[in-house]
A protein has these predicted regions:
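Intrinsically disordered, low-complexity regulatory segments enriched in Ser/Thr/Pro
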Residues: 113-127
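Generic detector of low-complexity/intrinsically disordered segments
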Residues: 5, 21, 107-108, 128, ...
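Compact, glycine/acidic-enriched structural inserts
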Residues: 123-148
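Short, surface-exposed coil-to-beta transition loops
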Residues: 100-105, 131-132
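A surface-exposed partner-binding patch
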Residues: 1-101, 150
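Short, surface-exposed beta-strand/loop micro-motifs that present aromatic residues
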Residues: 95, 103-110
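Aromatic side chains
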Residues: 23, 31-34, 118-120, 142-145
């Protein structure tokens, strides 16, 4: 794991279960462990690159914040962002973070070959983004996603 952020603290297993129930998803063990140990975090003052290359369009994004559960920090909660964009994102997905490029990191639990972590360019900052396509596959699992991050 090369992600470098200032953690928000620790999520409680009970709150993780409530999140899963609210958005009708089943989070994988590796992501639950991340929430319990760090509960997300911020790249304060953009000290670290935290970059990921989107291979299909040859663009790079930089992680700003990984959201958590009940962080008590403005604009840092999974529930807040997922609820706000619920009608715009895939069913059975949650928004788990954002980037310096103003897009979101989306964890989609589709139950098929398409599930995984995506970059959702809701503001069309990337040249390749359009109304037809503004979500880009990054990784199948949270562990694979973490392995993509460069600093």
């Amino acid at each position: 794991m090369v992600l470098t952020i200032e953690p928000f603290g620790h999520a409680e297993y009970e709150n993780i279960k409530l999140l899963e129930k609210r958005f009708d998803i089943k989070l994988p063990v590796d992501y639950k462990e991340f929430l319990v140990t760090q509960n997300g975090g911020r790249n304060s003052s953009y000290t670290f690159e935290n970059s990921i290359k989107i291979d299909q369009i040859d663009e790079v994004i930089n992680i700003d914040t990984m959201f958590g559960i009940n962080t008590g920090i403005k604009n840092a909660d999974i529930e807040q962002w997922t609820e706000e964009y619920r009608n715009d994102i895939f069913e059975h997905s949650i928004i788990i973070g954002d980037t310096i490029q103003h897009g979101f990191l989306l964890f989609w639990q589709s139950g098929d070959d398409n599930e995984g972590i995506y970059y959702y360019d809701d503001t069309y900052q990337l040249e390749a983004s359009s109304d037809e396509n503004n979500a880009y596959f990054l990784a199948k699992t949270f562990s694979e996603f973490m392995d993509l991050i460069q600093n």
